[in-house]
Amino acid sequence: MGQKCNPIGLRLKIINTWDSLWYANKDYTTKLHEDFLLRKFIKKAFYHAAISKVVIARKVDLIMVNVYSAKPGVIIGKKGADIDKVKQQIVKMINNNIELNIIEVKKPELKAVLIAENIAQQLEKRISFRRAMKRSVQNCLKIGAKGIKVSCAGRLGGAEIARTEWYKEGSVPLHTFRANIDYGFSEAKTIYGIIGVKVWVYLGETKSSNE
């Protein structure tokens, strides 16, 4: 089971929590779709800001959006000009008041999503997939990860037949629920087609939130 499903979803309410912090009796699908559009828009608007996650909380007349980024300066811009512009665009899109908070990610080398995006960007620049995977794995372990596993799938190196290549170092116990495992996925759009990049990072054992 642990090998097949998303490690973050599997550990919800054990050591992880949701990225959408709200409850709704009605209009649930509308609000869920709004969350999806918000995340998509923010990711697209700040593609180079290394965004690891977007947490959305709702009140009656306010939507609070916390953006976790390794490069907060890219989002804020000069004197906050960029962030104000994005706020106005979001208000137009969802027709509601919004509070946008930017939170800096201290160790981006340990965030699986950012590692996957970094590898995907290297593949798009035609860097060897083995070199890209190995470099990211070494950087992650150097910062303090207990283990990391990386998978690249597609027409690697322009090969005629698609295949999957793995690179793993250290321990990644996917079946252990108390194991704090971060998971990330990204796609590299190359001239040969799309290459999928998956990353699992083991950060050590954590006490469950129920204890």
From Swiss-Prot:
Any one GO molecular-function label of the UniProt entry: structural constituent of ribosome
InterPro entries per record: KH_dom, KH_dom-like_a/b, KH_dom_type_2, KH_sf_prok-type, Ribosomal_S3_C_sf, Ribosomal_uS3_bac-typ, Ribosomal_uS3_C, Ribosomal_uS3_CS
Tree of life domain: Bacteria
Keywords: Ribonucleoprotein, Ribosomal protein, RNA-binding, rRNA-binding
GO biological process terms, semicolon-separated: translation
SUPFAM superfamilies linked to this entry: Prokaryotic type KH domain (KH-domain type II), Ribosomal protein S3 C-terminal domain
Domain KH type-2 positions: 38-106
Any one of the GO CC terms: cytosolic small ribosomal subunit
A Pfam family that the UniProt record links to this protein: KH_2
Function as written in the Swiss-Prot or TrEMBL entry: Binds the lower part of the 30S subunit head. Binds mRNA in the 70S ribosome, positioning it for translation.
Family the UniProt entry places it in: Belongs to the universal ribosomal protein uS3 family.
PANTHER family named among the record's database cross-references: 30S/40S RIBOSOMAL PROTEIN S3 (PTHR11760), SMALL RIBOSOMAL SUBUNIT PROTEIN US3C (PTHR11760:SF19)
Record note on quaternary structure: Part of the 30S ribosomal subunit. Forms a tight complex with proteins S10 and S14.
This protein's name: Small ribosomal subunit protein uS3
